[in-house]
Regions:
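Acidic, small-residue rich beta-repeat scaffolds with periodic aromatic anchors
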Residues: 13-18, 37, 41-49, 63-155, ...
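Surface-exposed loop and turn segments in beta-propeller and other repeat-based domains
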Residues: 168-181, 290-292
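Bacterial N-terminal signal peptides
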Residues: 1-6
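Hydrophobic beta-strand segments that make up the repeating blades of beta-propeller
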Residues: 200-206, 256, 260
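Repeated scaffold domains used in trafficking and secretory/extracellular systems
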Residues: 182-188, 239-246
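Residues in Ca2+-coordinating acidic/glycine-rich loops
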Residues: 190-198
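Beta-propeller blade signature
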Residues: 218-226, 275-277
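N-terminal signal peptide c-region/cleavage motif recognized by signal peptidases
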Residues: 8-10
Length: 292
């Protein structure tokens, strides 16, 4: 469960810059996120129109003034491809380098131009699209986000579901959500019910009436409806998330617990188990206890 959370000005401290270019004749997109913690590091995603699958980049140490070689996580245990950028400067207007086959050493020239910088400083305004890396056989996802200069939190106003087969948008969900401090992780994916396609959750965006501060809450859940072939919100899951803790098993079972279910004397915690039938229905299955 992700509960209510006030986003502070430091929450947007990881700037992400998107770039576009071509690899041969194929359009490609690269997003690089800079994390200043632990001496500095880069992460992000790689996207090629030939596959239409945003793939995460391996988090890689980076020191200003040095070149960057960053693996594409096409294989989580043994990446086969990397992006080499030399020279490299974080947030640069243009990048050049190559796509490297790590098995053969073959390199393909790569030239990229900056599209949008989703800035870390409150002084920076921005507007643009960010893909959300996840493996799904049918779809990929993007969010449209904007922030005015001086604002603390960037706002997402649309979530787009795009066909991997055609590259065309099949659904656009409008609303108000917070852009995550790492913008490429704004959508959190998982299997929330027994359906092969990915479901996702996202943090809402609301302004406090008393002080005007932005709150990134509540958590919203979107589940794929096979009958309607669209993603739909699940209000019951959202209420459970407000009341306690949620977790999901690989089989699509939802498990719920709350403070009242904890027995500190016996060091046990009760969990109620549910099956998600549709984006509107839950079925209670049973309860069980776990020791802690």
């Amino acid at each position: 469960m992700v509960g209510l959370g006030l986003i502070t000005p430091t929450a947007q401290a990881n700037p992400t810059t998107t770039y576009r270019g071509t690899l041969g004749d194929t359009p490609v997109e690269l997003a690089l996120t800079y994390d200043s913690q632990y001496g500095g590091g880069m992460s992000g995603y790689w996207f090629s129109e030939s596959e239409r699958l945003p793939m995460a980049l391996e988090s890689t140490p980076f020191h200003p003034g040095s070149a960057l070689l960053i693996n594409i996580m096409d294989n989580p245990t043994l990446p086969a491809t990397a992006v080499s950028l030399q020279p490299f400067a974080e947030g640069a207007a243009a990048l050049q380098g190559s796509l490297v086959d790590l098995r053969t050493g073959t390199q393909q020239p790569l030239q990229l131009q900056r599209v949008t910088r989703f800035g870390g400083s409150q002084r920076e305004a921005f507007e643009g699209e960010l893909l959300q890396p996840v493996f799904d056989r049918d779809f990929y996802f993007s969010v449209h986000a904007a922030r005015k200069a001086g604002e603390e939190v960037a706002q997402v106003d649309s979530i787009r579901v795009i066909s991997r087969a055609t590259g065309k948008r099949v659904q656009e969900i409008s609303g108000q959500w917070c852009l995550s401090s790492v913008g490429t992780r704004t959508l959190t994916f998982g299997h929330f019910h027994a359906e092969a396609r990915m479901d996702f959750q996202v943090q809402g965006y609301r302004v406090g009436e008393a002080d005007g501060r932005v709150w990134c809450s509540p958590t919203q859940y979107y589940l794929y409806s096979r009958d309607l072939r669209t993603y739909r919100r699940h209000p019951q899951l959202e209420q459970f998330a407000v009341d306690g803790d949620l977790r999901f098993s690989p089989s699509g079972q939802m498990e719920f617990s709350k403070q009242d279910f904890i027995n500190y004397d016996q060091r046990t915690r009760r969990w109620d188990y549910y099956r998600v039938i549709t984006p509107e229905r839950l079925e209670y299955l049973s309860s069980g206890e776990e020791r802690f």
